[in-house]
């Protein structure tokens, strides 16, 4: 039996895979996500499936959408996956394939599948994956909740126009058929959304600071480029 990977080992593996400094505004985001994913994946009841993959990809891409420099976003994602013993290319493919399955075909059929209705048409073996969630041991996680909701939202947007209504039906119709606490799922989704709002606000502040610094620099350059008045002209004007 392999020993359980420690958090310090996971952190060391991440910083070894990504030795560059992380943008200060996102350092806490990355560290908190790394800790959360570590605790999720070392759980003996953790099960990897496409919904977890979609949740992780959605979480990461949403939180890191405005990261600068942008070319480093994928490098950080790859380092996270490597530290967690996950394959980034497999994660992204599984997430992409799941979304494509949910967006193809009849939205009502896909909705019924997520609700585990007996008459629902199965696609991509998703019914067995969802049924597996009903059989203990199966570890719940915020990442899984985001993955389930993202898959659900791909079909529910055309069925329920209001966000509050979509969330209510998700908790009642999807989570209600799974052994997960609707209250906890709701709280985790709210936390995810509040984190996105907080990052957007921080990003707006940073962008405004950058614009202000740029304007100040332009004023300095404009002042420096003005021609200097000759001394003789200054004496004549003063006389």
From Swiss-Prot:
Q: What name does UniProt use for this protein?
A: Protein Thf1
Give the protein's function.
May be involved in photosynthetic membrane biogenesis.
Q: Name one GO cellular component term.
A: plasma membrane-derived thylakoid photosystem II
Give the record's GO biological process terms: photosystem II assembly
| Matches recorded under InterPro entries | Thf1
The residues forming a coiled coil are: 183-219
* Renumbered residue ranges of the record's region Disordered: 211-239
Matching PANTHER family: PROTEIN THYLAKOID FORMATION 1, CHLOROPLASTIC
What protein family is recorded? Belongs to the THF1 family.
Q: Which UniProt keywords apply?
A: Coiled coil
Which residue intervals are annotated with compositional bias (Basic and acidic residues) in the record? 211-221
